[in-house]
């Protein structure tokens, strides 16, 4: 039986080289496994030819592919918030537009959905990144568990399937990568069922991550502390 209703979206920043293969694979998976779906790409102020690539892909793949365009880069949190706001189906799945996760594993997340399930979160079976990124990711996961009581094993794995009605009830405010902590913390506090699935992680083939630049790391740290004050200290 096919999954009933699903929005899939990808935040994208200078991801033009990876988007064609990623989107074609996504449509193949959804055609086989989902009855009613839509695919959204949030072009977060890309400076490469992402816009032109997406225009061509809309012509190729048809009206089920929509593009949300930010004139200026709003950060990872801003891109996710736009993706959630644009999603119209019963469940929402998102992962990054850089191709480090494969849409082929999405059916494994869908299989975990039950009547009470609100979140199915992936976790990396093995991380294929440079050593400094692996170390920073481990520290970030540790801080998320220590400061926020996050129970999932990999907050840094952006491969998530979420019941949309839960998203509609919450107000997300983060503009950086801390949105993942805010999102999961609020979902766990809602009392919804949570499942976890191990997924493959692949080396990045094109471009570089925004998150691991000094300025981005500093912004993330400041926002993480502000989030802790609001969601934990003052809660």
Predicted regions and their residues:
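Donor nucleotide-sugar binding loop of glycosyltransferases
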Residues: 15-18, 46, 76, 102
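Acidic helix N-cap motif at the loop->helix transition within catalytic regions
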Residues: 17-21, 48-57
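Short beta-strand/loop segment that forms part of the nucleotide-sugar
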Residues: 35-45, 66-70
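A conserved acidic beta->alpha catalytic loop
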Residues: 43-52, 99
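Acceptor/aglycone-binding surface of glycosyltransferases and processive sugar-polymer synthases
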Residues: 68-86, 91-94, 100-177, 204-229, ...
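Catalytic donor-sugar/metal-binding loop of nucleotide-sugar-dependent glycosyltransferases
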Residues: 151, 172-175, 184-202
């Amino acid at each position: 039986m096919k999954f009933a209703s699903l929005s899939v979206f990808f935040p994208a920043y200078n991801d033009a080289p990876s988007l064609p293969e990623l989107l074609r694979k996504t449509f193949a998976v959804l055609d086989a496994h989902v009855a009613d779906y839509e695919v959204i790409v949030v072009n977060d102020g890309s400076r490469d030819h992402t816009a032109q690539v997406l225009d061509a892909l809309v012509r190729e793949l048809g009206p089920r592919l929509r593009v949300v365009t930010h004139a200026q880069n709003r950060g990872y949190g801003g891109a996710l918030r736009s993706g959630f706001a644009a999603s119209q189906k019963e469940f929402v799945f998102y992962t990054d537009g850089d191709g480090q996760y494969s849409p082929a594993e999405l059916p494994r997340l869908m299989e975990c959905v039950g009547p009470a399930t609100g979140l199915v979160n992936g976790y990396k079976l093995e991380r294929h990144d440079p050593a400094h990124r692996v170390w920073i990711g481990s520290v970030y996961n540790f801080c998320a568990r220590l400061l926020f009581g996050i129970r999932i094993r990999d907050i840094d794995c952006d491969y998530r399937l979420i019941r949309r009605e839960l998203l509609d009830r919450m107000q997300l405010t983060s503009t950086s990568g801390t949105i993942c902590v805010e999102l999961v913390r609020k979902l766990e506090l809602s009392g919804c069922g949570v499942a976890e699935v191990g997924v493959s992680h692949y080396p990045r083939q094109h471009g570089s991550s925004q998150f691991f630049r000094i300025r981005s790391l500093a912004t993330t740290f400041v926002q993480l502390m502000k989030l802790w004050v609001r969601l934990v200290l003052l809660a």
